[in-house]
Structures are given as C-alpha cells and as structure tokens.
Amino acid sequence: MMYHIPGVLSPQDVARFREHLEQAEWVDGRVTTGAQGAQVKNNQQVDTRSALYAALQNEVLNAVNQHALFFAAALPRTLSTPLFNRYQNNETYGFHVDGAVRSHPQNGCMRTDLSATLFLSDPESYDGGELVVNDTFGQHRVKLPAGDLVLYPSSSLHCVTPVTRGVRVASFMWIQSMIRDDKKRAMLFELDNNIQSLKSHYGESEEILSLLNLYHNLLREWSEI
C-alpha cells in the first residue's frame, strides 16, 4: 500500500531546509547506488561527509519519529540515515528497484520494507519530477506539497520523471518495519485508524478497549523485534 503522510515538516521548517540546502555541497547521486541503479540514475545528492548533512538528516529523523501517522503506517523498527537529492535540467532516475538490504551505522544492516520520500520543493516550482510507483494496484504518480511524505513498499518498481523546469529537492530513506508483511501491516493500520475514529466520536468504551486489545495482540503476534 502507498500512504500520503501530510505535514511532516511545517512550511517554516521547509523554508529553513531549503535555505540550508542551497549552501550544501552536492555530489553525483550515483555514489549511493548499486550497479543496476547507476545505469538509470542522473541526479545529485548532498555530500554525506559534511557537518550540514549530519545536522539536516538528524532533523528529518526527529520529524518522522514524532509524526503519529508515520508511525502508525510504517510501524518502524529501524530507519536508515536520510539522504537528500536534487533534480534539475532534465535530470531523472529511471525505473529501478531498491536493494533489499542496506548497511546501517548502528545495526550493521537492515531490511528495506518501506521507502519514503519527503518533498522539500513546492510542486508549482518545477515541471516533471513525479515519483512513479508501480505496484499490484497499478501505476501511481506522486507529486506532493513541500513538507509532505509518501510511503510505499520498497519492493515496488519506481522512477522519477525528468525535471524540465525548476528544481526538485527531497529527502529519502528506507524503513525496516516491525511487521515484515505488507498486508498485515496494512490491516493493522486500518484497524488503528478505525479505533482512533471511534474514540473521537464516542469516547472510551468497553468495545473500543476490546478492539485496542485485539490490535496489540495482533501486533504482538506478528512483530519482529
């Protein structure tokens, strides 16, 4: 399933990120890509050796960790170190699949269950640059407001279309979920959403407590910690 997570960064945070990123050192985006991806990748990424990068990636991690909807949809166990990319002058990233396992600075390695893109450019400021994701439900074309995030299975083929005007800047990362199976994770997310909706309409009740108990028992049964 694909999820739109709005308001991960406020407009003020986005403006500050953009100001800092204009001062950043950018390198060829292929430095973080395997052999297959390097053949179709043409973009730039912030140099991960800089102090500015270290500060910005930490802010992204803090923002997603504090976002309740992101947590409910992803049920994250491990988050990769966020990266930052930039597309301009017809730069693009052709169809590719993300690697199943990535190195992780604390855990040694992590499984990539979910991929996330946090948009940092207003959609009106550039042409093209759509994230295109192919999954079992068809093809999805994504171009979200700055500060919003899209979450989708890392197993999906995806691409970024050429940016023909302006500049598209984003942060991206991978998530190892406590729930490996996409369908089980989607069921838990739907159950959680319905529990929260019932609580907001009717307050606490024995029935809602029973549903909450069911949610946590399923999470206990399915989670990998």
From Swiss-Prot:
Kindly list the GO molecular function terms attached to this UniProt entry: 2-oxoglutarate-dependent dioxygenase activity; iron ion binding; L-ascorbic acid binding
Domain Fe2OG dioxygenase positions: 78-177
Q: What class of enzyme is it?
A: oxidoreductase
List the disulfide bonds in this chain. Answer: none
User: Is Oxidoreductase found in the keyword set?
Assistant: yes
Whether Hydrolase counts among this entry's keywords is no
E.C. number(s) listed in UniProt? 1.14.11.-
Q: Which NCBIfam families match?
A: PRK05467.1-1 (NF003972), PRK05467.1-3 (NF003974), PRK05467.1-4 (NF003975)
**GO biological process: what's one of them?**
intracellular iron ion homeostasis
SUPFAM superfamilies named in the record: Clavaminate synthase-like
Note accompanying the cofactor annotation:
Binds 1 Fe(2+) ion per subunit.
Record-given protein name: PKHD-type hydroxylase YbiX
Entry-linked InterPro entries = Oxoglu/Fe-dep_dioxygenase_dom, PKHD_C, PKHD_hydroxylase, Pro_4_hyd_alph, Pro_4_hyd_alph_FE2OG_OXY
> Any idea which positions bind Fe cation?
96, 98, 158
Annotated residues that bind 2-oxoglutarate are located at 168
Keywords for the protein's UniProt record, in alphabetical order: Dioxygenase, Iron, Metal-binding, Oxidoreductase, Vitamin C
The prosthetic group or cofactor this protein requires is: Fe(2+); L-ascorbate
